[in-house]
Regions:
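A membrane-interface helix-boundary motif in multi-pass transporters
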Residues: 205-226
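C-terminal transmembrane helical hairpin of 12-TM major facilitator-type secondary transporters
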Residues: 97-171
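Extracytoplasmic gate region of multi-pass secondary transporters
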Residues: 46-110, 169, 199-203
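A late C-terminal transmembrane helix in Major Facilitator Superfamily
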Residues: 175-211
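C-terminal membrane-cytosol helix-exit motif in multi-pass small-molecule transporters
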Residues: 1-33, 230-238
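Multi-pass alpha-helical transporter architecture, strongest
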Residues: 2-8, 223-256
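Juxtamembrane helix-start elements in MFS-like secondary transporters
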Residues: 87-96, 146, 150, 181, ...
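Transmembrane alpha-helical cores of Major Facilitator Superfamily
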Residues: 64, 97-101, 128, 186-194
Length: 263
């Protein structure tokens, strides 16, 4: 048209140039395409398919049981420290603050460890920490004057607080892939609430008298549950239908990063 002709005639230097911001739009489009391509390569099982595998139900049960240690100490640490350990209200309040910090540290530590040492070692290490924490709590009742043992007990038992919530996000992609991660982890929410229901019913009558003997029995039961949860989770993870593909893709990504760093 005449208008288009005049624009070209008056601004010949702009013919063939791209609009302002075009390069940024190209970068965004390339990033989106790369993300979609990566997701398609990662793949994974949808929820309906995952539920048909033994791995799904093993991990469901493992996560449910692994919630017991954290729930037990959150619910009964007050009765424990003010009962058999003999802390007064003010001293206990100070230690409760330390316990909360340890819970947060435990969540951060689990995230770092999963990236550095892998899911299998993380599961083993965190459950060993849980078992060690409750073992220290049992010994502490025979050595109530030991500040060092009290500190170690609070740190270890605090770190096992997020055992189930912080473990699931790393186990699920490895077992079932990342593609349907959101819907699969949502289906595990019920498992991670089992401890809130079962632990009070299980331990309430045992520690009703608040004695060292009753707490010792309760903590021994929790140690047993922690060991069982670790084994079940590892079996479920090793039987994960997508684990081989996940590890192969992760190794490929690691190799690409190394190659990029060398360049």
């Amino acid at each position: 048209s005449y208008i288009a002709f005049k624009l070209v005639e008056d601004n010949p230097e702009k013919v063939g140039t791209k609009a302002y911001g075009y390069e940024k739009a190209e970068e965004i489009a390339a990033a989106v395409a790369a993300k979609k391509e990566k997701e398609s390569r990662q793949g994974g099982l949808d929820l309906a398919t995952a539920r048909k595998t033994p791995s799904y139900w093993l991990m469901w049960g493992g996560l449910a049981i692994s919630s017991f240690p954290g729930v037990a100490f959150r619910f009964y640490n007050g009765a424990f420290f003010r009962g058999p350990i003999g802390l007064d209200t003010v001293t206990y309040s100070n230690w409760a603050s330390v316990l909360s910090v340890c819970i947060a540290v435990g969540m951060i530590l689990m995230g770092v460890m999963a990236d550095k040492i892998g899911s299998v070692k993380m599961v083993v290490l965190m459950h060993v920490i849980s078992i060690a924490g409750y073992a220290c709590a049992i010994v502490l009742m025979k050595n109530t004057g030991s500040f060092a043992l009290l500190l170690i007990t609070v740190i270890l038992c605090g770190m096992n607080g997020p055992l189930d919530n912080a473990t699931a996000p790393y186990l699920i992609p490895e077992a079932f892939g990342r593609k349907y991660y959101d819907e699969i982890i949502g289906s595990y929410a019920g498992a991670m609430m089992i401890g809130n229901v079962c632990v009070p019913m299980l331990l309430g009558n045992i520690i009703s008298d608040g004695t060292a003997a009753s707490f010792g029995l309760a903590w021994e039961i929790i140690i047993g549950f922690s060991a069982v949860a670790m084994v079940i989770l590892l079996v479920g993870l090793f039987r994960g239908p997508y684990r081989k593909q996940y590890l192969a893709l992760k190794a490929e990504e690691s190799q690409m990063k190394k190659s990029g760093a060398e360049v």
